[in-house]
């Protein structure tokens, strides 16, 4: 597929105009990997392919469950076609187990199960370090309406339920994950961005070893091996996507 003008370049993805439809974009997954707000950076050859294929599969799972996303179709192993969204400047985090920043700022035990899950909203800003915000902050900054925030929370919990069950069959624990949302051309709040080892904590169900970006954050070994293991499990039964995996 041809791609048009570069619209946006993020830490690990690039968005291009769609060659035929102004309401669509082509999202390309690069091999860049970052952590700690760009304090740690590297390039891992093939990582973008794993993230693209995993995201495509998980978006398809959500769409099959009736959860609206920006996903339209897979273009190739690195690119997908998505709806053009008016994005909220927010990140929504859903936590099923206590780990990461949660245990650093609150008295939870590492690995503690959270039932019901905890949902947090962060202001998406490298300058301010993505601080957690509540409805008062969101309202004062004009980031979203109360109805939009409630819809994002509702969708996040639905995503959690659907993906937790799907990943259980892949012998993966969905520890926590980050979502981004936007409004599509029809005025609907939908899940955007990606759902991948870059934005989720995936733990092996038996060993609780990381199959995600924590391998890079914590220097725990071969990042690509973890992403590949996650991809092979998540894409099980999807021969078309499995055939696109590197190597």
UniProtKB/Swiss-Prot annotation:
Q: In which pathway does it act?
A: Purine metabolism; IMP biosynthesis via de novo pathway; 5-amino-1-(5-phospho-D-ribosyl)imidazole-4-carboxamide from 5-amino-1-(5-phospho-D-ribosyl)imidazole-4-carboxylate: step 1/2
Ligase as a keyword of this entry, yes or no, is: yes
Q: Name one Pfam family in it.
A: SAICAR_synt
* GO biological process terms on file: 'de novo' IMP biosynthetic process; cobalamin biosynthetic process
- Primary enzyme class: ligase
* Keyword rRNA-binding included in the entry's annotation: no
Gene Ontology MF annotations: ATP binding; phosphoribosylaminoimidazolesuccinocarboxamide synthase activity
Q: Which UniProt keywords apply?
A: ATP-binding, Ligase, Nucleotide-binding, Purine biosynthesis
Catalytic activity reported: 5-amino-1-(5-phospho-D-ribosyl)imidazole-4-carboxylate + L-aspartate + ATP = (2S)-2-[5-amino-1-(5-phospho-beta-D-ribosyl)imidazole-4-carboxamido]succinate + ADP + phosphate + 2 H(+)
EC number(s) in its UniProt entry?
6.3.2.6
Entry-linked PANTHER family: MULTIFUNCTIONAL PROTEIN ADE2 (PTHR43599), SI:DKEY-6E2.2 (PTHR43599:SF3)
Please report which protein family the annotation says this sequence is part of.
Belongs to the SAICAR synthetase family.
Q: What is this protein called?
A: Phosphoribosylaminoimidazole-succinocarboxamide synthase
According to its UniProt entry, this protein's organism is: Methanopyrus kandleri (strain AV19 / DSM 6324 / JCM 9639 / NBRC 100938)
What gene codes for this chain?
purC
């Amino acid at each position: 597929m041809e791609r048009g003008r570069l619209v946006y370049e993020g830490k690990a993805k690039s968005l291009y105009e769609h060659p035929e439809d102004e309401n669509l974009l082509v999202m390309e997954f690069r091999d860049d990997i970052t952590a700690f707000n760009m304090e740690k950076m590297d390039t891992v050859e093939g990582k973008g392919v794993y993230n693209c294929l995993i995201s495509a599969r998980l978006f398809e799972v959500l769409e099959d469950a009736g959860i609206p996303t920006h996903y339209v179709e897979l273009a190739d192993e690195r690119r997908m076609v998505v709806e053009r969204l008016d994005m909220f400047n927010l990140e929504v985090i859903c936590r099923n187990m206590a780990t990461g920043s949660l245990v650093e700022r609150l008295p939870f035990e590492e690995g503690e199960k959270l039932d019901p899950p905890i949902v947090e909203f962060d202001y998406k800003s490298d300058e301010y370090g993505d601080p957690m915000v509540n409805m008062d902050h969101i309202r004062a900054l004009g980031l979203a309406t109360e109805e939009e925030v409630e819809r994002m929370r509702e969708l996040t919990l639905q995503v959690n339920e659907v993906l937790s069950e799907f990943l259980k069959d892949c012998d993966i624990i969905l520890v926590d994950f980050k979502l981004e949302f936007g409004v599509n051309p029809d005025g609907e709040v939908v899940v955007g961005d990606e759902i991948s080892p870059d934005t989720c904590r995936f733990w092996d169900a038996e060993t609780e070893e990381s199959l995600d970006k924590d391998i890079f954050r914590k220097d725990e070994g071969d990042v690509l091996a973890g992403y590949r293991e996650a991809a092979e499990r998540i894409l099980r039964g999807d021969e078309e996507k499995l055939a696109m995996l590197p190597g």
